[in-house]
């Protein structure tokens, strides 16, 4: 007979054994091949609880000054926009220095080098790698995915990243962070000695093969893994013979599957199916996948659980999802977030400043905020973020006499773009001064316009708003620097050129036998109408009829006649051939010049003297001004800008402009010596007349 306490002990032992069997079933009973024992699947509640533990207090974070490394493959115009939103979300939450390793094509590199150089974010290092070097390594793999060859390049990252780099987080451009990336980096410490890659389980049934009839996916463990967020332990990867491993697997599977459907993700999963010990499953909140067939809602309970949102559907923000509106709003928050605010982060780490930022900050702190012209001085020192070729752009084939129209505008002038495209069939380079939010409105405006969406030879460059004064000459310089043709027509957005002007300018350049060695500025006579609706003249004869009838006027004839008087409109009426004119004080014609002409003086911001200074520079460099007899451009009426209103109403504003003029002439004297005396004399005479 057993002692009275013995049955209770045996009962407890049986219960404990049953509990262990249940736990073992959950950990190891899901899939004969899925013996990872580290996380549960989307179909099971334990998965949710374990994944939500990612932010638990037990997570040991690296030191605050440890550099975190992030690799991103980015190609083309659209991905270059996507990566900015991703970067904003990264920077918003991060507390560690970041080193971004960007594998780019030539288009993306040109865009992103300019953007990050002008963004000047502290404690961020950016390195670029040429994606062309990786193409031969993956071009043998047929790929049905819309990402093309670039979607396979994560397989070969170890061959292009520095050998000294041990660990890196690899991201797709279509992810948005809602947490500090250092928490993700800390998960490297959870890897076993044999694990080389960290991935989140795929959150759809794609790899189960039951989405539609005869669907045959690549092999995977259970649901497989998604490669939108990857933790790569690079040195271990090399030691395992990764290159040989994935190539052998890919070649074997391609014998029957013929092509990848999900690019690198298919090959990663096939390798992991064969070598499950290589993968460390990550908590699902680090890659909440919003694909067409996602079951991601099983991963999170509330917004605080989310770490990374992955828009991995071709539909992107238009994907149908139970919580799509919430995710969309989170993404749109960063889309419209003012990127300049991310410059002001405080890091107690050495070498946190980007090149030139420390000197710039010192110059700004030396300014006297009580000085009347403080705004002008501050604006001169402002470095604006610049996103060149904001939209897809197809430059025209090179032609020896081709001309690009160059102009700048702000949001309130967008309505001019369609009319300008109808009048000018040639290439254009336009700089837009916008906030981050306005840039998205502009994007929508172009995409929904039948006229603008068809014009791929128009390059739009966004200069992000920063400061109270309009940086007109910096905008012009941005647009001018991005022109790709031998000649440029330096215009303004409120002007519509004659319908025939583009062809006429090219023919004139050829007939006059101009080349870059001949310093010539072709003057396009400027006119204006005070009517919002009028019949645009198709020829010089029609224009003269409207001029005689009082429907048109020479530009600014009643406010600023000296600005265009040297063009000599009386002579132009009768002219049959180009004629030469001399510079005079305050002359500011619209001209066609070689692309390598002098840049505009960026000290002139707001309203006043910005074009005048440029024409003086052309004259000082001995450009000849030739007026074209059949050319014309017409200014349309519009509401006055804020800057011109301030110029008219504020004596301080006008005094500051006068101070800038004097500084400009002092610089001219230093550069051109006695040859610049005539410009100073003209300025003094104009001041005495005033």
Swiss-Prot record:
InterPro entries associated with the record:
Glyco_trans_8, Nucleotide-diphossugar_trans, Xyl/GlcA_transferase
**Residues carrying a glycan:** 51, 78, 202
Quote the Pfam families the UniProt record gives.
Glyco_transf_49 (PF13896), Glyco_transf_8 (PF01501)
**What reaction gets catalysed by this protein?**
3-O-[beta-D-GlcA-(1->3)-beta-D-Xyl-(1->4)-Rib-ol-P-Rib-ol-P-3-beta-D-GalNAc-(1->3)-beta-D-GlcNAc-(1->4)-(O-6-P-alpha-D-Man)]-Thr-[protein] + UDP-alpha-D-xylose = 3-O-[alpha-D-Xyl-(1->3)-beta-D-GlcA-(1->4)-beta-D-Xyl-(1->4)-Rib-ol-P-Rib-ol-P-3-beta-D-GalNAc-(1->3)-beta-D-GlcNAc-(1->4)-(O-6-P-alpha-D-Man)]-Thr-[protein] + UDP + H(+); 3-O-{(1->[3)-alpha-D-Xyl-(1->3)-beta-D-GlcA-(1->](n)-4)-beta-D-Xyl-(1->4)-Rib-ol-P-Rib-ol-P-3-beta-D-GalNAc-(1->3)-beta-D-GlcNAc-(1->4)-O-6-P-alpha-D-Man}-L-Thr-[protein] + UDP-alpha-D-glucuronate = 3-O-{beta-D-GlcA-(1->[3)-alpha-D-Xyl-(1->3)-beta-D-GlcA-(1->](n)-4)-beta-D-Xyl-(1->4)-Rib-ol-P-Rib-ol-P-3-beta-D-GalNAc-(1->3)-beta-D-GlcNAc-(1->4)-O-6-P-alpha-D-Man}-L-Thr-[protein] + UDP + H(+); 3-O-{beta-D-GlcA-(1->[3)-alpha-D-Xyl-(1->3)-beta-D-GlcA-(1->](n)-4)-beta-D-Xyl-(1->4)-Rib-ol-P-Rib-ol-P-3-beta-D-GalNAc-(1->3)-beta-D-GlcNAc-(1->4)-O-6-P-alpha-D-Man}-L-Thr-[protein] + UDP-alpha-D-xylose = 3-O-{(1->[3)-alpha-D-Xyl-(1->3)-beta-D-GlcA-(1->](n+1)-4)-beta-D-Xyl-(1->4)-Rib-ol-P-Rib-ol-P-3-beta-D-GalNAc-(1->3)-beta-D-GlcNAc-(1->4)-O-6-P-alpha-D-Man}-L-Thr-[protein] + UDP + H(+)
Membrane topology, as annotated: Single-pass type II membrane protein
- The region called Glucuronyltransferase activity is annotated at 344-686
Tissue specificity, in the record's words, reads: Highly expressed in the testis and kidney, but weakly expressed in the heart and brain. Expressed during embryogenesis from 7 dpc.
Intervals, Lumenal compartment: 30-690
Keywords (A to Z) from UniProt: Glycoprotein, Glycosyltransferase, Golgi apparatus, Manganese, Membrane, Metal-binding, Multifunctional enzyme, Signal-anchor, Transferase, Transmembrane, Transmembrane helix
One Gene Ontology term of the biological-process aspect is:
protein O-linked mannosylation
- Chain ranges sitting on the Cytoplasmic side read 1-8
Function, in words: Bifunctional glycosyltransferase with both alpha-1,3-xylosyltransferase and beta-1,3-glucuronyltransferase activities involved in the maturation of alpha-dystroglycan (DAG1) by glycosylation leading to DAG1 binding to laminin G-like domain-containing extracellular proteins with high affinity and in a phosphorylated-O-mannosyl trisaccharide dependent manner. Elongates the glucuronyl-beta-1,4-xylose-beta disaccharide primer structure by adding repeating units [-3-Xylose-alpha-1,3-GlcA-beta-1-] to produce a heteropolysaccharide. Supports the maturation of DAG1 more effectively than LARGE1.
SUBUNIT field = Interacts with B4GAT1.
What's the name of the protein? Xylosyl- and glucuronyltransferase LARGE2
State the species of origin. Mus musculus (Mouse)
